[in-house]
């Protein structure tokens, strides 16, 4: 599950648990801090409102434990994979701008495309990680 749909991983766990058979495996996809930003300003430059928006990887695994789950598998994005994920968004914005130059949102999309690559390589690339975690309730 994508945890933002339920206000975070605890909310997503609660929703997903309703559909899980006993002994079933829950998959949670969640960003985490690879390294905690030194300031709130850097966190905001990463595109979040606060350093408290995400946990570190040890903090996230500990939070799953606190919710009563064993982590039985995890697949973490490496930086190259994350780079490709982010860059695909830039290409999508560029193609959208080419196809929709007169759209009301074109100026906003152009402004985002102008800053997104530099912001990513300056701030988010070193700070963000992302993983999918396989969990089984105890």
Describe the role of every protein-language-model region.
Residues 4, 51-52:
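Residues that cap or flank secondary-structure elements
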Residues 10-25:
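A short glycine-rich, Lys/Arg-flanked "PGG" loop and its adjoining helix->strand segment in the class I
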Residues 26, 31-36, 76-81:
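Short "lid" loop at the C-terminus of a central beta-strand within the Rossmann-like core
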């Amino acid at each position: 599950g994508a945890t933002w749909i339920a206000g975070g991983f605890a909310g997503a766990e609660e929703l997903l648990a309703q559909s899980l058979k006993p002994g079933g495996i829950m998959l949670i996809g969640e960003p985490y801090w690879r390294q905690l930003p030194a300031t709130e300003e850097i966190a905001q430059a990463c595109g979040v409102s606060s350093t408290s928006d995400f946990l570190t990887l040890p903090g996230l695994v500990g939070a799953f434990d606190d919710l009563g789950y064993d982590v039985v598998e995890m697949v973490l994005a490496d930086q190259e994979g994350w780079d490709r994920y982010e860059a695909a968004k830039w290409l999508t914005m560029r193609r959208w701008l080419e196809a929709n130059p007169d759209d009301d949102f074109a100026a906003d999309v152009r402004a985002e495309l102008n800053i997104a690559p530099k912001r990513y390589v300056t701030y988010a690339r070193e700070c963000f990680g992302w993983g999918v975690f396989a969990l089984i309730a105890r």
